[in-house]
């Protein structure tokens, strides 16, 4: 009896599962239709009968809707690719126009920059012309400066000799003006340079040379006699200082030389 009851329960369960399996596909038609995109065709939406096939059916419907649009997309892409060189050319033209406007705006500065070497060359030529004009205007001073160039070199090498030579310059000019009168002293310089230098060192103390060259030459003629009578340089210097006050030495040097008593009384 119990076995019969158990078999009856099993049959009721199987019938209930079969009824449920036949109902679910019929109830799932409305949700599936609501999930499909609106741009799909009715034929595509009607084929969706099983929920398991829903993703695959949706993918096929999307592909079927996109494929008719693909030729237009390819045509637009090819047109864009063909227009790329024109875009590059247009960009280059814009850059060239901007550069041209910049050059036109700074044309003055650009021209000045290009003319800088010419300006420097012109300035150098002007300086050279000014120097040449200065040399031509002061040709005498320039030649005199060139003549003194050896003395300047001597001053750089030996300052003492340069100072001694500078002290002798006035008398050298006087000797050039009166070469015959200075001939004995030139011979003395050739024979005894030390005595000549001592004699020339005493000459600046005589103011008579600047006042009267003739009297100075007479005084120079008397120097050899003083070199014999006054071997001391200090004594000779004192005699040189007394010469302007002795009028006899200027008028008659021979008579003045015959008066050694004056020298003995003074020194």
UniProtKB/Swiss-Prot annotation:
Keywords: Repeat, Seed storage protein, Signal, Storage protein. InterPro entries: Zein, Zein-alpha. Residues 1-21 form the signal peptide. One of its GO terms (molecular function) is nutrient reservoir activity. Pfam families: Zein. The alpha zeins of 19 kDa and 22 kDa account for 70% of the total zein fraction. They are encoded by a large multigene family. Structurally, 22K and 19K zeins are composed of nine adjacent, topologically antiparallel helices clustered within a distorted cylinder. Zeins are major seed storage proteins. Belongs to the zein family. This is Zein-alpha Z4.
